[in-house]
Amino acid sequence: MQSNITLLKSRRANKVAMKRLSAAKKFLALNKNEDFLDEMFRALWGFVSDKLQIPVSELSKENVSFALAGKKVSGESTQLFIQTLDACELARFAKSMAAPNAEIYRQGIDVISKLEEEIG
């Protein structure tokens, strides 16, 4: 039973991430920066958690990098994922040094699409 739930989560990971990215885009248009960043984090972390079957309590950049390498994901895609997370963190905690939110949004879509292609 648990393996069926895990498999279902993995299959739906991209769809769920795209819904979260859609919500993030709405917050971006409304200039609600905190809500935008929250949805970006949920989309990114949720996607890898569901796709790679990593429990939320074990999510870290190191664990995700290791799991992506185990799935034969390119180093470039792994690095792009980490950079996108870093951009979100920078936007949240050091706003003056951060990339524009529209750029972060575009990166989020790109990295999730690349990971979906490579992981399958």
Where are the language model's segments positioned?
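Solvent-exposed, low-complexity, intrinsically disordered
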Residues: 1-120
